[in-house]
């Protein structure tokens, strides 16, 4: 993959075709493979097989999994949540997302649950993207300050454009 590749999300919903897509993270960094999630089983497999990684992404995948399940069987809310919860029993964001979805959807008529499940999953995705962007914005300011400090403290032959920072990233980078 190019270091200058365009920015992508790791999960997204395509209104055209009514489908959920993920980047298969087991293939990174050697290949960029897009997988379409069409069923609850697909969402469960993506979580279990670690095709999606990172706590927020696992929770968002589960939320879309509930939507996919309800599309196929409008009566499946509780069983879908149970199956998804079993994929990673210790994943806090997974349990949190499923609790949020269950609480919101149980209060609705079955006929309204499908559209609401999609809206909730998309809102979780948007909220997480905003949080990650804020993390990036804060981190950028810190990195700029560190680079400036490094440029000022190094001998002249190593400063300026030749100064660099070595960065190791984790999770939400």
Annotate each language-model stretch with its function:
Residues 62, 169-173:
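Short, well-ordered beta-to-alpha junction loops that form the rim of enzyme active sites
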Residues 9-111:
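Long amphipathic alpha-helical segments
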Residues 2-19, 85, 89-166, 170:
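C-terminal binding/interaction regions
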């Amino acid at each position: 993959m190019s270091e200058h590749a365009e920015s992508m999300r790791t999960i997204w919903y395509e209104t055209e075709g009514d489908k959920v897509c993920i980047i298969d993270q087991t293939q990174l960094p050697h290949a960029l493979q897009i997988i379409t999630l069409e069923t609850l089983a697909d969402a469960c497999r993506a979580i279990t097989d670690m095709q999606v990684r990172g706590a927020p992404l696992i929770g968002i995948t589960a939320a879309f999994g509930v939507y996919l399940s309800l599309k196929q069987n409008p009566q499946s809310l509780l069983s879908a949540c149970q199956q998804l919860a079993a994929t990673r029993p210790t994943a806090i964001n997974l349990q949190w997302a499923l609790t949020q979805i269950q609480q919101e959807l149980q209060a609705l008529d079955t006929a309204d649950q499908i559209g609401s499940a999609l809206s909730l999953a998309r809102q979780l995705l948007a909220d997480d993207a905003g949080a990650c962007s804020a993390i990036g914005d804060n981190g950028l300011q810190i990195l700029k300050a560190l680079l400036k400090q490094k440029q000022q403290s190094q001998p002249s032959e190593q400063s300026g454009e030749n100064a660099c920072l070595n960065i190791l990233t984790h999770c939400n980078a």
